[in-house]
Design a protein with these regions (language model features):
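Active-site-adjacent substrate-binding region
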Residues: 44-132
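Acidic/histidine-rich catalytic neighborhood of metal-dependent amide-processing enzymes
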Residues: 1-50, 86
Length: 132
């Protein structure tokens, strides 16, 4: 297992290079909160699709099943105006399963607000998923 920390999703190249043996990649970013979305600041968001297209169905399903099995507060949402570092990985030609999770965050960039429960649910989902 590799842990990669990137901070370049805003410019589109954060995940453009990953170890050659990478099979799965889960990006941890922010989940959106707002009208027509299921996520709140207290939840972990599991993104099914964003501006780059759908995330891997099996990964999304596995994350949702893991969240449910561990009693975590979660929502599955679609973010049409959002992108993550996983997009750069796919654009670079890596054929991997990919997913995106994150704590629900109200607003972004200039004023981001979340709740410790959202951060906890995100951490617990990641921990449980990696441990299985």
């Amino acid at each position: 297992m590799s842990l990669l920390f990137t901070v370049y999703e805003e410019v589109g190249h954060g995940g453009s290079v990953v170890p050659a043996d990478t099979q799965d990649m889960i990006s941890v970013d922010m989940g959106c909160v707002g009208a027509d979305l299921g996520c709140t600041e207290r939840m972990v968001s599991i993104c099914a699709k964003d501006s780059g297209g759908p995330y891997n169905y099996d990964i999304v399903s596995e994350l949702a099943a893991c969240a449910k099995a561990n009693g975590l507060d979660y929502a599955i949402d679609v973010y049409p105006h959002y992108g993550s570092d996983v997009e750069a990985t796919l654009t670079a030609g890596f054929d991997i399963r990919h997913g995106l999770i994150g704590p629900g965050v109200y607003a972004s960039h200039n004023y981001e607000r979340s709740h410790m429960d959202g951060v906890r649910n995100t951490f617990e989902l990641l921990r449980a998923y990696v441990a299985q």
